[in-house]
From Swiss-Prot:
The active site is at D283 (nucleophile). It comes from Cellulomonas fimi. The lineage of its organism: Bacteria, Bacillati, Actinomycetota, Actinomycetes, Micrococcales. Catalyzes hydrolysis by a double-displacement mechanism via a covalent glycosyl-enzyme intermediate, involving the participation of a catalytic nucleophilic group in the enzyme active site. This is Beta-N-acetylglucosaminidase/beta-glucosidase. It holds the Pfam family Glyco_hydro_3. Keywords: Carbohydrate metabolism, Glycosidase, Hydrolase, Polysaccharide degradation. Catalyzes the cleavage of beta-N-acetyl-D-glucosaminides and beta-D-glucosides. Might be involved in the degradation of glucuronic acid-containing glycosaminoglycans such as hyaluronic acid. Its EC number is 3.2.1.21, 3.2.1.52. One of its GO terms (molecular function) is beta-glucosidase activity. It catalyses: Hydrolysis of terminal non-reducing N-acetyl-D-hexosamine residues in N-acetyl-beta-D-hexosaminides; Hydrolysis of terminal, non-reducing beta-D-glucosyl residues with release of beta-D-glucose.
Amino acid sequence: MIDLTAAPFSLDDDGIAWVRTTLAEMGEDEKLGQLFCLITYTSDPEYLGYLTRGLHVGGVMLRTMTAADAAATVTTLQSTATVPLLISANLEGGASQTVQEATHVGSNMALAATGSTDHVRRAATVIGREARALGINWAFTPVVDIDLNFRNPITNTRTFGADAATVAAMGAEYVEAIQAQGLAASAKHFPGDGVDERDQHLLASVNTMSVEEWDDSFGVVYRAAIAAGVKTVMVGHIMLPAYSRALRPGVADRDILPGVVAEELLNDLLRDRLGFNGLVVSDSTTMAGLASVLPRSQAVPRVIAAGCDMFLFTKNLDEDFGYMRAGIRDGVITPERLDEAVTRILALKASLGLHRGTNLPAQGAAGVLADPDHSATAREVAASSITLVKEEPGVLPITRERYPRVLVYDLQNGGSPIGQGARAGAVEQFVDALVEAGHDVTRFEPGGGWEGMAAPTTDVTERHDLVLYLANLSTRSNQTVVRIEWAEPMGANVPAYVHSVPTVFVSFENPYHLFDVPRVRTLINTYGSSPVVLETLLAALQGKAPFAGSSPVDAFCGQWDTHL
């Protein structure tokens, strides 16, 4: 029996009565629909009405759109739903991932680089305030993974770094601050990403920690989030073999499954050992991390049967609903388990006050998004986070008088259709700022010529006063590495002039580029590329502001030569 009076629901008598009455009035189809949190890219009323009246979905996740479209979408959904919806969004770095006009406050790693939980609290408050004004009530944040493996292609700047105590403290601060704004937070990605160098989007990855190691790291992190009152936990397609073996003695290797379908991790570890009473949601079920371990027909109902309360996204809407219905019919999901999951979904809604009608966008949402205090917070985070990792004496500052002629090497990857990846145009924006500051900027273009036919080195050493690398390479789904791919021929754009021309390397995203450019003597990490970050970076390079951040990870990647 779920204790609805206990944290994180903490319901009063009216809330409990609403949960019990609503559950009792539901038929099987309504209960089935509540299990699903679907994605919406559109504000089309007909489609949205189908989600609420036809499928009875429990929630949706908004993808990138304008503030007006987001408000219209939420209004349509909530006004047509019999049971109010959970409106979720990926709020990593800010509501700007979902709403174009919102403030990008800064990545988790930028917040960690400030060394201040006060910055975390203020950032989460801004994010929550903007999201709630738009009718968003469920934040798919914070990421509380620990970035222990610099080769991991998906955690990176999304995390609070590599120190478990820091991640625990900042994750808990984030949870308290954003939930104080009326949203449910979601600590992710249980049982913990950042250990494997592979991406759970593309396979079932492995957290290789022993039971003791996990307890002393991720265990500390999740206990802190739970103590802070986190309402939901998102479970990834990540295996934790040591704990699966400890909790299921004799389990065969082939039967060790990722967290999202591992009953021993969801119930024995998360519920019983860690004491989590809130809602458990799967990570996206469209990921190969789930598809690679079970056929879809089995995987869909197993997610709920194993202990997740909500099923995130579908591969094929009709097919997945059919698989879930079959799982209920065939007893894979028992009536008791179905009611337990739906009860937690309804309890989460009641804990947010949705049963009282506090679920529509605010009339003054545009004013909230334009609040100058929010942009001021973003500036303070940027000013406190940009990190001078490595410095060659005498190279900085960069001024027009010292370096009139600058050769820029830009290293970039693109964004994805769903808004992930590096911010397009960041390098161009920074180059424009250099030109405006009076520098004569040349952007490197690879030329022809193999051995014996390349341009003379004096073309660089005598024509340029500074070499500046601008790397805008970020983590994104479906990418197995976040490394530099050099140009032909023969690495035409590698740092070949570090002994001849002052060279500065700036990474807008990935903090681990020293692994590929160990001989670069001056390197700066910014952990983001928003206009505010670029403006702050330029001021620091010019000597007008300090480099105030401290690296939350080993930017030297454990290598001796990166210190040269």
